[in-house]
């Protein structure tokens, strides 16, 4: 694709050794290679005046990740990537690969419109009762036996859903659904505010042994 070009790869694997991260950046900085190819770790904090082109592959995977903060985090990350290009005397260009170029995140990114993004994102969160306009908790379930993990998540959802002020979403498999032999499921609890959630979670802790067998462990992420 780029004949004659040399690449520097920077990710968790290549930067694992002591001093490897800085060594790779130093090599790229003195132009031992033409292209720096890496994961999110190359998005911010790097200053190479001769870099004039930045590219993002499959930006949709970040924007559509199953998390209410996904679009916000993607916008911030893409803005950081854009800042890596054109830091010297030559102007830079940024290419973003997407199947949805009309997504508001990308349109506002193109315009560098922070205020416009905040306006749309906050309006959506208010409508859906997501933080900071509502309470949200994620219950994560782990275990080697998929049936027991899913069963515990489903039973917990039924128990929490008994409170009419709480909306239960899921359970659903996480991404990835299985990691190092451990199955991963989660369910989300939505409520008008954190106080309601704290009451429900307090009741859940008192009764967790009723729904969570020894084959599954769990923890809470309170937004």
Where are the language model's segments positioned?
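Accessory helical-bundle/CTD segments and flexible terminal tails appended to RecA-like ATPase motors
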Residues: 1-65, 71, 80-223
């Amino acid at each position: 694709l780029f004949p004659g070009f040399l690449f520097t790869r920077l990710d968790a694997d290549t930067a694992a050794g002591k001093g490897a991260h800085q060594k790779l950046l130093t090599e790229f900085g003195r132009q031992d290679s033409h292209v720096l190819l890496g994961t999110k770790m190359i998005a911010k904090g790097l200053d190479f005046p001769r870099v004039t082109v930045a590219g993002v592959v499959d930006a949709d995977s970040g924007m559509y990740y199953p998390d209410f903060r996904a679009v916000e985090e993607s916008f911030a990350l893409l803005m950081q990537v854009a800042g890596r290009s054109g830091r010297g005397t030559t102007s830079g260009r940024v290419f973003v690969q997407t199947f949805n170029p009309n997504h508001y995140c990308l349109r506002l990114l193109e315009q560098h419109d922070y205020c416009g993004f905040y306006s749309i994102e906050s309006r959506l969160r208010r409508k859906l009762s997501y933080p900071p306009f509502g309470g949200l908790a994620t219950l994560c379930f782990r275990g080697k036996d998929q049936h027991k993990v899913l069963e515990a998540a489903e039973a917990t959802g039924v128990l929490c859903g008994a409170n009419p002020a709480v909306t239960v979403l899921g359970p659903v498999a996480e991404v990835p659904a299985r990691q190092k032999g451990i199955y991963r499921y989660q369910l989300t609890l939505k409520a008008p505010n954190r106080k309601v959630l704290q009451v429900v979670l307090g009741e859940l802790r008192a009764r967790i042994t009723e729904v969570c067998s020894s084959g599954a462990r769990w923890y809470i992420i309170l937004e």
